[in-house]
């Protein structure tokens, strides 16, 4: 979907804030009746603008008190090595995000763990066992200043 009008953007903003908003509430807030509002939401879903609906869960409530950002440098940057690394880390629940980067690192990962011992186990039993890693640098988050999954619309 290439062009989003003001109503589409308002719908997206509201749904990003509360994905459980009823269609009636959504329609009222964007100034439409329910049917046209529903059609717009369905169109946004069909076009992939709305990719899914999820519940955000507090990581500390699950006992995951440690957030770690890990810079990974591979020994080689060949496509097969990049693909092998991406396949491996995609299977690990501890890895919440992974980005292929430019600059002095190849990958940046965001990982959560219950505590330092759990992170150490992840590091020793998973990450360091992957072939082709030249260096691993871990940075621990002291506190979370801002967190949002809502995109600017």
Question: What label would you give each PLM region?
Answer:
Residues 1-153:
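A compositional/biophysical signature of low hydrophobicity enriched in polar/charged and small residues
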């Amino acid at each position: 979907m290439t062009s989003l009008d003001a109503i589409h953007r308002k719908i997206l903003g509201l749904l990003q804030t509360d994905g459980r908003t009823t269609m009636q509430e959504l329609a009222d807030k964007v100034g439409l009746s329910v049917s046209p509002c529903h059609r717009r939401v369905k169109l946004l879903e069909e076009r992939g603008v709305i990719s899914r609906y999820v519940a955000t869960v507090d990581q500390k409530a699950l006992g995951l008190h440690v957030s770690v950002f890990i810079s990974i440098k591979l020994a080689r940057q060949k496509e097969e090595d990049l693909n092998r690394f991406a396949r491996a880390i995609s299977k690990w629940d501890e890895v919440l995000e992974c980005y292929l980067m430019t600059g002095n690192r190849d990958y940046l990962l965001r990982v959560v763990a219950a505590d330092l011992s759990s992170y150490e186990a992840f590091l020793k039993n998973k990450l360091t066992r992957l072939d082709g890693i030249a260096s691993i640098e871990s940075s621990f988050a002291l506190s979370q200043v801002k967190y949002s999954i809502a995109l600017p619309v």
